[in-house]
Amino acid sequence: MLEEECPVFGKKLLEWYLNNSPLLDRKWRHDRDPFRIVITEILLIRTRREAVERIYDEFFFRFKSPDDILNATEEELRKAIYTLGMRKRTELLRKAAEYLKLHGIRSPSDIEELPGAGEYVKNILKLRLFNAGSVAVDRNGARVLFRYFYGYVPEVEKPEKRKEIAEIKEKCLDLYEDKLTLSYALMDLGYYVCKPRKPECGRCPLKDTCKYAKDTP
């Protein structure tokens, strides 16, 4: 079933993303500096991307290296990111900076040891830094996948960890060559269109073949 549905899903999703990418784009997606890439993904954990965008330039003007983060006072670091929320974010930033300083990231396996990095962060970092690994599925992407292929979203804390997502990745998503673009397309569709409440099915490129859209008045 997945194998039959996958080509249509991927084609429509990627077409939508490529047609809309100028409007969806974020400046950090063009970064090539490993330090900035890793730290940005820490900043993005459990917060809205617009909040990160508002502090992005000022943050990296102040913190240009792991040492800049490690040498900053707790007050300086908190002040720089307080609008993002999450109490432990300063701790995660320091641990990531320390890891980058002491070990660096020279291969995908190094990312596995990065403190504070969950499955999604590890996957997106492997793709961005090495073009390696699996498609990165965050909560937004997981919501798209569940609604499209199963017609519902499970009421669990981390749907991206469900076995159904692993099956979709294995039999569908990871067959695509450009996994980074597919990752961005998934998360953007979930963020802007396939929202947690009141998804905008009418303007979704997948609506004609989506199980959730078909069953929703």
What are these regions (language model features)?
Residues 1-111, 174-175, 192-193, 197-217:
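N-terminal polyanion-binding entry modules of DNA glycosylases/AP lyases
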Residues 24-28, 132, 151-156:
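Short, polar/flexible loop-turn hinges at active-site or ligand-entry regions and domain interfaces
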